[in-house]
Amino acid sequence: MALSRVCWARAALWGSTVAPGPFVTRRLQLGRSGPAWRAPRSSKLHLSPKADVKNLISYVVTKTRAINGSYHRFLGRHFPRFYALYTTFMKGIQMLWADGKKARRIKADMWKQNLKFHQLSYREMEHLRQFRRDITKCLFVGLISIPPFANYLVFLLMYLFPRQLLVKHFWTPKQQIDFLDVYHGLRRRSHSEVITHLRRASTFVSHEKLRRQLTDLCTKVQSGTHPAAQDVLALRDCFSTYPLGFSQLQASQMRALSQAMLLTPYLPPPLLRQRLKSHTTVIHQLDRALAKLGIGQLTAQEVKSACYLRGLNSTHIADDRCRAWLGEWLHISCSLKEPELSLLLHNVVLLSTNYLETRR
């Protein structure tokens, strides 16, 4: 301090312009107001943590998409067959996941509004019905994948047997047509057996007029004639009691009808009867909901799916003819009561056997 004062005094006396030393300069700066000597802050140097995270996520997503696109192009160029299977599998997972979310939403609405299955709209009922079948098949594949290293074998089996182990979400467009033809061929094998059982049962019908009408109907179908709706409805009394009511069907009849409905026939007779009745009741409920909605409100794919469920191989039939056939089915179904649903079950064979191109 004494030295600095001496320097300043000498400078004042001599009128010199000598600058103070670095130590003195720093002391003078420290003596001034504090904030004045600091450098101004720059907002660009201090980004918020949220902005940094968003920029990082955006960068990672962009890079991932670019790498994924390059990977897809590589597979498409060098492994086209594998790439087709890969894209079909990935799309199938997305569609199955979307179906699961939709089914969950429908079930939640049913619980909140205290609705029963038959009180839903047609599309909601059909979605739940189909999703239950799909998820049952997926659960079976999941169960056989549980043992260690079994998942590798399951992937191989899914590649070799896609029709048996995979649902339609994982089929290619060509496979969908081919597999539906295969399934229809399986159920067509039972058509002649179902008609034979009907002819045999006609001998036990007590009413003479009904017995003759049932025999004539079997003869028409066996000769290649498509029956009219009024001819089928005239026999509704035969299917409410012995010998063709649900409770009176024999085991061989139920096995043949199960094959016609694409259900397993290898179950005890009580389970076969219960399962056939349950599926027929669901179809009857769907028919009532569809009649309320109107066939004209359905898309072409929805019409084909509805016809296929009811026994018609609609994959090779024009849309207008599918709608006409579905109209005949609904006319019969909506005229039946619950005790007469055995006729609706047999309708799977009676109405589909000789309809247009379905007979091959």
Swiss-Prot record:
Entry superkingdom: Eukaryota
Keywords: Membrane, Mitochondrion, Mitochondrion inner membrane, Mitochondrion outer membrane, Nucleus, Phosphoprotein, Proto-oncogene, Transmembrane, Transmembrane helix
GO biological process, one term: response to lipopolysaccharide
One MF term in the entry's GO annotations: ribosome binding
Subcellular location as annotated: Mitochondrion outer membrane; Nucleus; Mitochondrion inner membrane
Domain Letm1 RBD: 178-360
Protein's membrane topology: Single-pass membrane protein
Description of the deletion phenotype: Homozygous mice for Letmd1 gene are born at normal Mendelian ratios, with normal morphology, bodyweight and body composition at 2-months old. Mice could not tolerate cold exposure without food. Mutants exhibit impaired thermogenesis and are prone to diet-induced obesity and defective glucose disposal.
Tissues expressed in: Highly expressed in brown adipose tissue (BAT). Also detected at low levels in white adipose tissue.
Residue list for modification Phosphoserine: 192
Induction: Up-regulated in white and brown adipose tissues upon cold exposure and beta-adrenergic signaling.
All ranges on the Cytoplasmic side of the membrane: 1-137
Residue ranges of the TM segments: 138-158
Region (Required and sufficient for mitochondrial import): 1-110
Main location (coarse class): mitochondrion
GO cellular component: mitochondrial inner membrane; mitochondrial outer membrane; mitochondrion; nucleolus; nucleoplasm; nucleus
Mitochondrial intermembrane face residues: 159-360
Record's function text: Plays an essential role for mitochondrial structure and function, as well as thermogenesis of brown adipocytes. In brown adipose tissue also localizes in the nucleus where it interacts with the chromatin remodeler SMARCA4 to regulate thermogenic genes expression, such as UCP1. May regulate phagocytosis and inflammatory responses to lipopolysaccharide in macrophages. Involved in tumorigenesis and may function as a negative regulator of the p53/TP53.
PANTHER family named among the record's database cross-references: LETM1 DOMAIN-CONTAINING PROTEIN 1 (PTHR14009:SF13), LEUCINE ZIPPER-EF-HAND CONTAINING TRANSMEMBRANE PROTEIN (PTHR14009)
Subunit-structure text: Interacts with BRI3BP. Interacts (via C-terminal) with SMARCA4; the interaction regulates transcriptional expression of thermogenic genes in brown adipose tissue.
Protein name: LETM1 domain-containing protein 1
Species per Swiss-Prot/TrEMBL record: Mus musculus
